[in-house]
A protein has these predicted regions:
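DNA-contacting surface of Y-family translesion DNA polymerases
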Residues: 1-123, 139
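Acidic, metal-coordinating catalytic segment for phosphate/diphosphate chemistry
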Residues: 88, 96-175
């Protein structure tokens, strides 16, 4: 007649351990990489490499969590504190056909999301990438419409790129 929570509370008050702290460690539900700019950005060609860099960092974080994502969101916004300038804020979400943690796929989605939300004539103060809809990296899902490249090669390539980026050298992607 009691709820599960009340039953656990009673049992724990009697000295019986019901939940381990380690049992409740859950992986992240989303990864956000964003920054406010020191100087306002009003040019798409300046904004593209910034957003690309955010996508690369987000993909690295995703792999460090041993996850894949099915959704990439890109956002841009002007400063809400500068009332004298025109305001613009937008977000575009791109669904991925199959879950991925491949930087190249996330970069492609980020670029696809950035182009329709950018408006010339605005001084952007912040941009970012949001990854969500995670699955475990060991779960394999293939698309009927996409010829999967050798997933082992993609995994190895991303591992090597992460190792190279963790040293003093850094790989830059053309965007």
């Amino acid at each position: 007649k009691f709820s599960v929570v009340l039953e656990r509370t009673v049992r724990e008050l009697r000295g019986e351990r019901c939940l381990n702290i380690e049992d409740d460690i859950s992986s992240k539900k989303q990864i956000v990489v964003s920054r406010s700019f020191g100087e306002r950005v009003s040019n798409l060609e300046t904004l593209k490499p910034i957003v690309s860099n955010f996508a690369v960092r987000a993909a690295e974080k995703l792999r460090s969590e041993r996850q894949k994502c099915s959704q990439v969101s890109v956002f841009v916004r002007t400063s809400p504190f500068n009332k004298n300038k025109p305001q613009h804020s937008d977000l575009r979400t791109i669904g991925l056909i199959t879950p991925t943690n491949d930087t190249r796929d996330i970069l492609t989605a980020a670029k696809k999301g950035l182009l329709p939300i950018f408006r010339s004539g605005y001084d952007y103060a912040k941009a970012g990438i949001i990854l969500n809809k995670f699955t475990n990296e060991h779960v394999k899902q293939h698309s009927l419409f996409k010829d999967p490249n050798d997933p082992k090669q993609n995994t190895k390539l991303m591992k090597y790129l992460d190792q190279m980026n963790s040293y003093e050298t850094q790989i830059y992607y053309a965007s």
